[in-house]
């Protein structure tokens, strides 16, 4: 009897100390936000954008100098992906056309005969013009976009600005630094911001994928979870090999994979009362894909013939709602946003309101 009382007493003391710490942190106006999502969800872009808006200090020249070689590398890789695709699909009168504009046809002819050494490749101004022209051809864009955007979320930002970035005197501006992030980070990174009388700490788990159950408890003290989702990944293959309890064949694509990750993480008992905001990104890209791709062909659970974007948004939203194991706690909030639109990132008052309603 005494030992049982001792165990219960220790448990009560632990829970009490946790509650005291949480109240202390909130009284000090410290709000800790856990950010989750894959490398193409615009999670890192969001954090950098928020930091650039709310921090009084401008991005330093040292940041521009340090990221310059990476941007050149990313630009070169995007160029090579476009050229490789063109040269792997030679055109003839018998083949299906892949370009529809005069500038696109000229660029295709130039790039199809372009010779380069992969390990000594430099994006020149002349090459940038042809890459820009062909990637702005509507028909060609429908072919190339899924390929290059699956590799980098900033791929089309690079293409859009390739003429400027190919200049010999190019120096990255603030937007370049924000948008052209270093992908495939696997550590945990904090971004701290003081806004008004409150301090916000964004905790980014990077792209850690292994043994989530072993490390997720380290973030049990977060006040809110931001879960980022790229809507246009419904036709891309999943990244991970599922556990024994989850057959690989049960995961259809990267969109479905991220919904399963959501299920695994936010339904952990550590987060049963933690508000969760799901942020849908790349809505415009999804709409563009749906013009040429049928959603139900890549997502068998979607039992509808409609390829209407609004119907598909509703379906994806419901997938998250159905996977919330604690619906009575009213902790789930779903929104769409554009990571490059600064007007949509002013959400701190909204976060505060959610926290006030849930404390």
UniProtKB/Swiss-Prot annotation:
Keywords: GTP-binding, Lipoprotein, Magnesium, Metal-binding, Myristate, Nucleotide-binding, Transducer. Residues 200-209 are annotated as: G3 motif. InterPro entries: Gprotein_alpha_su, GproteinA_insert, P-loop_NTPase. Residues 29-359 form the G-alpha domain. Mg(2+) binds at residue 44. A lipid is attached at residue 2 (N-myristoyl glycine). GTP binds at residues 178-185, 204-208, 281-284. Residues 32-45 are annotated as: G1 motif. Residues 277-284 are annotated as: G4 motif. One of its GO terms (molecular function) is GTP binding. Residues 337-342 are annotated as: G5 motif. GO terms for cellular component: cytoplasm; heterotrimeric G-protein complex. One of its GO terms (biological process) is adenylate cyclase-modulating G protein-coupled receptor signaling pathway. Pfam families: G-alpha (PF00503). Belongs to the G-alpha family. This is Guanine nucleotide-binding protein-like alpha-11 subunit. The lineage of its organism: Eukaryota, Amoebozoa, Evosea, Eumycetozoa, Dictyostelia.
